[in-house]
Amino acid sequence: MVKKYKVIDNFISKEALSGILLLFVTLFAIIVANSNFGDFYFNLWDKPLGVAIGDFIISMPLRLWINDGLMALFFLMVSLEIKRELLIGELASVSRAMFPFVASLGGMIVPASIYIALNPDNFIGFGIPMGTDTAFAIAMLILLGKRVNTALKLFLVALAVIDDLGAIIVVATVYTSELKLEYFLHAAFVYGLIWLLNYFDVKKLSFYLFLGIFLWIFIHETGVHATIAGVLLAFAIPISSRMNEKKFIEKTKADLEEFERCMDDKPILNHRQINALEGIAYGYDRVQNPLIRLEHDLHGFSAFFIMPIFAFSNAGVLLDFSTVWTNWMIVLGVALGLLVGKPLGIFGFTYAATKLNIIKKPKNISWFEIISVGFIAGIGFTMSIFIANLAFIDEDTISAIKIGIFTASFMATVIGMILISINYKFKISKA
């Protein structure tokens, strides 16, 4: 239990720092896009880059290498988190998972419904207000400090994990071009090989990652969004380690005793001590769960490299509000979906399901706090931008949507933080 909460604490702290970094990167991108360097900024991401393997060539603009390539690693990390939560985390128990599941369901259905109601002719953008930027949302809760209890943070993490799963399903099923059967068969063959590794209990991550590269290539060529390769790979990564904890402790103790026995007066280690250290390193490598190890390695890389790069390349928008008026119904649908749909859906679905005795509300979270977190979940930002780039092609439309996303996310942040602060003061006054 202690180990589980330590994993969650590490997750929350990294996400919080990443969220603050993303805020600065986003502001910098907007400043650059509207400065004298604006043309250079926009042209940079359209520069073509190609990779050739024999006669096979993949050539894409730099922005797509980020959105399809680096973001595949991000979705790999997210899917590893989802798998961990489903197997050993907050979502492992059906009773505990039901409340955030219903909340997330409402937080996706209501925003999408609001968007579709306002944009029946442009319904393809319904996925944009469904997203929650986990890093930003958690960062806002961390900034509130002791005003947010641990249970509320865990609820937001569970909500965000299920939300990410919903986003993955939408990307895989809705924002996919015409399928090419030939490459689909290639991808299926490679994925079959990956599962063979899992079946034969292969724990070496390098084998999975090597085949994962080919899986990404073939899925990219099928017409399915290439980030789905990261999702598929994650669910094939084994969770069990090559050495159990008890055996690791016994072996490490034996190696440490050997190291101590072989100590001498010389200032350098002798061969037997080096062998003992290698034995400890061997045990250290084998006791780690492949899934947890890969998630840990990717988390920092994703939080402090992939997402800032994605934000910098995609958040830059010309503050030309004429594009907003041209696309005002789409912008309104996105903004209201995030600002109104998220809190309304999260609160409404959980409240109704609780009254119908379908789920039980956690005792240490109030309904007022659920509404507050509903607004915080309305911070769509990077996930909403990512889906906007898939849903629309016209640059002016995407720019207008970005302005709507920024505005709604900012307002949702302010309202959510104010409500949580009011709730804290009310609790203090009653104490």
From Swiss-Prot:
Matches recorded under Gene3D superfamilies: Na+/H+ antiporter like domain
NCBIfam families on file: NhaA
Membrane topology: Multi-pass membrane protein
UniProt subcellular location: Cell inner membrane
GO biological process: regulation of pH
Role description: Na(+)/H(+) antiporter that extrudes sodium in exchange for external protons.
Recorded GO MF terms: sodium:proton antiporter activity
Sequence intervals crossing the membrane: 17-37, 56-76, 98-118, 123-143, 154-174, 182-202, 209-229, 301-321, 329-349, 373-393, 400-420
UniProt superkingdom: Bacteria
GO cellular component, one term: plasma membrane
The reaction(s) this protein catalyses: Na(+)(in) + 2 H(+)(out) = Na(+)(out) + 2 H(+)(in)
Short name of any one Pfam family annotated for the protein: Na_H_antiport_1
Similarity section: Belongs to the NhaA Na(+)/H(+) (TC 2.A.33) antiporter family.
HAMAP family given in the database record: NhaA (MF_01844)
Originating species: Aliarcobacter butzleri (strain RM4018) (Arcobacter butzleri)
Record's keyword annotation contains Ion transport: yes
Principal location listed in the UniProt entry: membrane
Protein name per UniProt: Na(+)/H(+) antiporter NhaA 1
Keywords: Antiport, Cell inner membrane, Cell membrane, Ion transport, Membrane, Sodium, Sodium transport, Transmembrane, Transmembrane helix, Transport
